[in-house]
Amino acid sequence: LMMTPFAFLQSPYRWLKAISDVQGPVMTGGPNFAYEICVSKVTEEQKATLDLSRWSVASNGAEPINLETLNRFYEAFKSTGYKAQASFPCYGLAEGTLFVTGGPKDKAPISLHIDADKIEKNVIDVKPTDDAIKRLLVASGTPAEEQSIKIVNPNTFRECSSTQVGEIWVSGDSVAKGYWNRPDQTKETFHARVVGVEDENHYLRTGDLGFLHDNQLYVTGREKDLIIIRGRNHYPQDIEETVSAADPTQGQNQSPIRVGNVAAFSIKIDDEEKLVVAAEVDRHYLKTCKRFTKLQETDEKPDPELDESGKQKYLSMDPDLVIAAVRQAI
């Protein structure tokens, strides 16, 4: 079952109703944010009209997968017959004919806690100590039978150890031959070879970073999106999740920060990388907001309460600029 993104954004209920109306097993899905939007936008009255019991494969890919989103979606729609084991985290890209890893089918998603401090140095520790700051990753499944996956150092082209983050390289029958009439880019992207091993395969360089654990692929982020602050690697989705989970009101009211409407990125100022965090907040909160910069740069630091909340969860540095915007601005 397929639907245009515009039609979905107009009415997330429309997507679920189309699934409900199919008289047979349904395989369809979307990125993580699609499930988050369904949780927040579909009403109880609309849920009462849905039968999602035949939704056998609910694929989730194209962006970082959040286990909390999967759990929230199940809790929100279990009354419609939706099954938790229908969730199907997967990984793919157009150059690999969309599907590279996924599943297993009819089983709960697999997740893993790693040491958040060590991954900033591209080191994977799947047994973090009790006092370590942890990061939860959802597996994107096992490689398809015809696919070969290597985790490779993008600078040396040598295969990484099992405890290192590297670039995801893919080889297999479903990988495209190259880009039409772009020979130089085709050679750079589709004809990569692993150095130091006997392997005649040509590999597709995905530009995505990750690692393999127990034959499950974990995607940590995209190489071009990495924010490098003081020699440490920070993934924008981690910063965005931290800000989304922060509560500037200290529990007094519903958090004004809109989940999923936060953007973290870096800019260069005087050849130095600076972190910028932009967040959509409730319009009423924006009027009295003192913890954010309102769409303009400032030398002042963010409020320490909000900053400390973020530090406890993930961040090891202060944002250089925090921007607050009204709804639908980001």
What are these regions (language model features)?
Residues L1-I19, Y235-I239:
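ATP-dependent adenylate-forming carboxylate-activation enzymes
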Residues F33-E36, E63, S174:
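Alpha-helix/helix-capping structural signal
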Residues G92, I149, N215-Q216, V243, ...:
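Residue-level signal for inorganic ion chemistry
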Residues L137-K150, P154-T163, E167-I229, N233:
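Conserved ATP-binding/catalytic segment of the ANL
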